[in-house]
Design a protein with these regions (language model features):
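Structural signature of outer-membrane beta-barrel channels/translocons
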Residues: 57-59, 89-93, 109, 140-142, ...
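Sequence/structural signature of outer-membrane beta-barrel proteins
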Residues: 33-40, 71-78, 108-114, 144, ...
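Short glycine/proline- and aromatic-enriched beta-strand/turn motifs that initiate or cap beta-hairpins
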Residues: 19-60, 66, 72, 106, ...
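Solvent-exposed loop/turn segments connecting transmembrane beta-strands
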Residues: 40-47, 74-81, 96, 130, ...
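Cleavable N-terminal export/targeting peptides
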Residues: 1-24
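Helix-adjacent hinge/juxtasegments
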Residues: 78-104
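Hydrophobic, lipid-facing positions within transmembrane beta-strands of outer-membrane proteins
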Residues: 50-54, 82-86, 100, 131-137, ...
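Repeated loop/turn-to-beta-strand initiation elements of outer-membrane beta-barrel proteins
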Residues: 25, 62-66, 95-98, 141-149
Length: 174
């Protein structure tokens, strides 16, 4: 866990050091629900969790950018997690202030389950890591030269089950 956090911090620092031109670098806040379909030992369950976090974007060209985010999913049923994802997005201009982007990336989820007891059966505290690809799309609306809002959908097959992530974001470009 410490190595992953250190890698995340180094990535943030290196992105900020290389962002020299206006519009190349953005930061912001992101939040929304994650709907997960969990199948285990013949049991199927749909599970919705809410998450919030931050993101950093770096434009490689006028159309390609990296999006690095960290999302904390609030505790539900003794389970919480932090998901760190890195996406490559391709931007299509739909108008002067509107962009559409498909995305492909990879995410790691670091989960923590608290110890609990149900019907005299106890569970130990447990930490685990899961990872996999994520595919999706989003739309961005520019609010002037530096501010923007966006919405995106990501499908995460195999990350803590099959996850469907819907996020709204607000950001600021440097």
């Amino acid at each position: 866990m410490k190595k992953v956090l250190l890698t995340f911090i180094v990535a943030l620092i290196s992105l900020s050091a290389s962002a020299q031109r206006k519009g190349d670098f953005a930061v912001g806040l992101r939040g929304g629900p994650t709907m997960t379909k969990i199948e285990f030992l013949g049991i199927k369950e749909n599970y919705t969790r809410w998450g919030a976090g931050a993101f950093v974007q770096y434009n490689l060209t006028d159309h390609f950018r990296f999006d690095l985010d960290g999302i904390y999913h609030f505790k539900k049923d003794h389970l919480s997690d932090v998901t760190v994802g890195l996406d490559l997005q391709y931007l299509f201009d739909l108008g002067e202030d509107v962009k559409f982007f498909p995305l492909v990336g990879y995410a790691l989820a670091f989960t923590h389950q608290d110890a609990y007891e149900v019907n005299n059966i106890s569970s130990d505290s447990e930490n685990s890591t899961d990872g996999g690809i994520q595919l999706g799309a989003g739309i961005q609306f520019n609010l002037g030269d530096n501010c923007f809002v966006s919405a995106e959908y990501k499908f995460q097959p195999g990350i803590l089950g099959d996850g469907h992530v819907v996020m709204a974001s607000v950001g600021y470009r440097f």
